[in-house]
């Protein structure tokens, strides 16, 4: 698997959700574009075999069980909401990079 190619594609696909013709992207918390981005990330991580669940405020948790210590957890985080006309890599790069790496 070419991780660089996969990561670039995922960044482009996620960036299209909430992209603004005036420049940048806007995915304010709890808006339709934010929810669509959450669902995109969920579908991508589930396709890689990770377990997913949302908490009561909309945080998406993705988990892959360890092979040696399946009950232990390492947490990492990022965000996909943006400010108005935010940059394309703001937050989502962390989400895309981590989930792509977990799939490798």
Show which residues each predicted segment covers:
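N-terminal capping segment at the start of a domain
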Residues: 1-31
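Generic alpha-helical scaffold signal
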Residues: 8, 31-39, 54-56, 70, ...
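A non-catalytic alpha/beta surface segment that caps or lines the substrate-entry region
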Residues: 19-65
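Homeobox/homeodomain signature
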Residues: 4-7, 18-20, 50, 70-73, ...
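Catalytic-core environment of secreted peptidases
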Residues: 44, 48, 60-93, 98
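Alpha-helical scaffold segments in soluble metabolic enzymes
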Residues: 9, 13-14, 40-44, 97
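Generic secondary-structure boundary/loop-capping signal
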Residues: 11, 22-25, 57, 77-80, ...
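Conserved small/polar residues in nucleotide/adenosyl-binding loops
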Residues: 100-104
């Amino acid at each position: 698997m070419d991780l660089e190619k996969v990561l670039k594609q995922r960044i482009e696909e996620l960036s299209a959700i909430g992209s603004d013709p005036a420049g940048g992207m806007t995915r304010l918390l709890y808006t339709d574009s934010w929810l669509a981005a959450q669902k995109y990330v969920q579908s991508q991580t589930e396709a890689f075999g990770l377990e997913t669940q949302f908490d009561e405020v909309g945080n998406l948790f993705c988990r892959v069980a360890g092979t040696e210590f399946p009950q232990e957890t390492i947490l990492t985080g990022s965000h996909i909401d943006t400010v108005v006309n935010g940059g394309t890599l703001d937050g989502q790069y962390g989400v895309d990079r981590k989930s792509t790496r977990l799939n490798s």
